[in-house]
């Protein structure tokens, strides 16, 4: 297969990358894949030097009559060449079994003769028997491919690959702490005040109930004595079949209740005393208004002063006014 030079390039069209047995054998006339004129340094082709026919479908057989079919993308073979009776589907360069990685088998021992019966398949088998594997990972392999890799031909010097991990297919069912939602942590973090989350709430104790006889004896003792000494409290607890802590707690609660009742009673008595005092003051004021003022001797002889002394604007009694006028006229 002849090599296309740069003068065959058309603007706007990518050059079809040729592929043949000569390039695999590093033929000097075609300038092998690793030659100085190869496209290894060309960044536009990427894997073109390793897989020359990775992006174009291969044509017919080689000019040397090897009988190997041209390989297209991912090892798709073309029709057999004129040298071999049966063209094989696979070429000398084949893709690896792992999806996402590429294995290029390069034949280093040479192809079959023009009359070989293997064709392209024979060249591929010979290439696999004496070729090295160049692995070019493109992306992460799928879980199914890693779990079930296809076996390669025996006797090949291969690069150590990733070993099969048991249970890789179940990776989707695995959960990790960092995958879990943070909502429950957020809920626990923002519920209530910070100091409420530090200590768990205390469990409430059931209320202690006493018998009627015990309560009556405690009330009698409390009316006689508001405070008990330690010995007295212990004797009372023993007599009532109670613990010392129960008697102590009951007296503390009873004193608190007694103080509250005493304060309420004092407040009620004070309000009642103030109410009685206001009532007495009002009655005294009403009596003072009802009693007549003693007549002044000076005012008795002066009618104007007498009228001014007996003037009561708040009084509606007209009889007083008439009496004042009669007294004044009598004095005159």
Curated annotation (Swiss-Prot):
The modification N6-acetyllysine is found at residue 238. One of its GO terms (molecular function) is DNA binding. One of its GO terms (biological process) is lymph node development. This is T-cell leukemia homeobox protein 1. Its main location: nucleus. Controls the genesis of the spleen. Binds to the DNA sequence 5'-GGCGGTAAGTGG-3'. Pfam families: Homeodomain. It is found in: Nucleus. It comes from the Eukaryota. SUPFAM superfamilies: Homeodomain-like. The keyword Transmembrane helix does not apply. InterPro entries: HD (IPR001356), HD_metazoa (IPR020479), Homeobox_CS (IPR017970), Homeodomain-like_sf (IPR009057), TLX1/2/3 (IPR042247). One of its GO terms (cellular component) is nucleus. The lineage of its organism: Eukaryota, Metazoa, Chordata, Craniata, Vertebrata.
């Amino acid at each position: 297969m002849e090599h296309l030079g740069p003068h065959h390039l058309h603007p706007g069209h990518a050059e079809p990358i040729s592929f043949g047995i000569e390039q695999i054998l590093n033929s000097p006339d075609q300038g092998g894949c690793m030659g100085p004129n190869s496209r290894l340094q060309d960044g536009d082709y990427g894997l073109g030097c390793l897989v020359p026919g990775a992006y174009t479908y291969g044509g017919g057989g080689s000019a040397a009559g090897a009988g190997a079919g041209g390989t297209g993308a991912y090892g798709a073979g073309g029709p057999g060449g004129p040298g071999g009776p049966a063209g094989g589907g696979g070429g000398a360069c084949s893709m690896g079994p792992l999806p996402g990685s590429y294995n290029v088998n390069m034949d280093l021992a040479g192809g079959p003769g023009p009359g070989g019966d293997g064709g392209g398949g024979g060249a591929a088998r010979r290439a696999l028997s004496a070729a090295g594997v160049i692995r070019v990972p493109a992306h992460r392999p799928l879980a199914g491919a890693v779990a079930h890799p296809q076996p390669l031909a025996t006797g090949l010097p291969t690069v150590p690959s990733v070993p099969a991990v048991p249970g890789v297919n179940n990776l989707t069912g695995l959960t990790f702490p960092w995958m879990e939602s943070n909502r429950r942590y957020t809920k626990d973090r923002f519920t209530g005040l910070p100091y409420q989350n530090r200590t768990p709430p205390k469990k409430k104790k059931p209320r202690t109930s006493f018998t009627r006889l015990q309560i009556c004896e405690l009330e009698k003792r409390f009316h006689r004595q508001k405070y008990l000494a330690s010995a007295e409290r212990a004797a009372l607890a023993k007599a009532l079949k109670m613990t010392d802590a129960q008697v102590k707690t009951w007296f503390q609660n009873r004193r608190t209740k007694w103080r509250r009742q005493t304060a309420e009673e004092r407040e009620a008595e004070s309000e009642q005393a103030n109410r009685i005092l206001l009532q007495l003051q009002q009655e005294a004021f009403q009596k003072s208004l009802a009693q007549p003022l003693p007549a002044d001797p000076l005012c008795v002889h002066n009618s104007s002063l007498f009228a001014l002394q007996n003037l009561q604007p708040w009084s509606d009694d007209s009889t007083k006014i008439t009496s004042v006028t009669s007294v004044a006229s009598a004095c005159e």
